[in-house]
Regions:
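Short, acidic/small-residue loops that bind anionic groups at enzyme active sites
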Residues: 101-113
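N-terminal beta1-alpha1-beta2 submodule of the flavodoxin-like/Rossmannoid cofactor-binding fold
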Residues: 1-104
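Residue-level detector of conserved catalytic or cofactor/ligand-binding positions
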Residues: 112-122
């Protein structure tokens, strides 16, 4: 099983990365392979609604980190998205990233529930 952890912070090794690394370590203790994917610090455009991803192109017409993620995500069993919180919401780049990834990724990005282990009660 593989879980892709997405760092939506413009700071590759900041607080969001630390939180994702902690989550990754817990998953790895359960035998889950993890990979942290940083969206980077370059601007990420929002969806322009052209529909190219649905009309045979098979990916977003805006060629950036979103297409790279969708390819990796198609092979993953689950995702964890981490983002700094700005004014009670995720950052703009992360919002645009997720909108485009889930739309252009189509069925490969559909919700798939996974179960890792039984919770323990104390």
């Amino acid at each position: 099983m593989t879980v892709l952890l997405v760092n939506g912070s413009p700071h590759e090794h900041g607080c969001t990365d630390a939180a994702l690394k902690h989550a990754a370590s817990v998953l790895e203790e359960q035998g889950v392979h993890t990979e942290i994917f940083w969206i980077g610090s370059k601007p990420i455009s929002g969806c322009i609604g052209c529909g190219a991803c649905k009309k045979g192109l098979g990916k977003c017409c805006i060629d950036d980190v979103v297409n790279e993620f969708v390819l990796k995500a198609a092979e993953a069993d689950g995702y964890i998205f981490g983002s700094p919180v700005h004014y009670a919401a995720i950052g703009g780049a992360m919002g645009a990233f997720m909108d485009r990834a889930f739309y252009s990724g189509g069925k490969s990005m559909a919700l798939s529930l996974i179960h890792i282990s039984e919770p323990t009660r104390h």
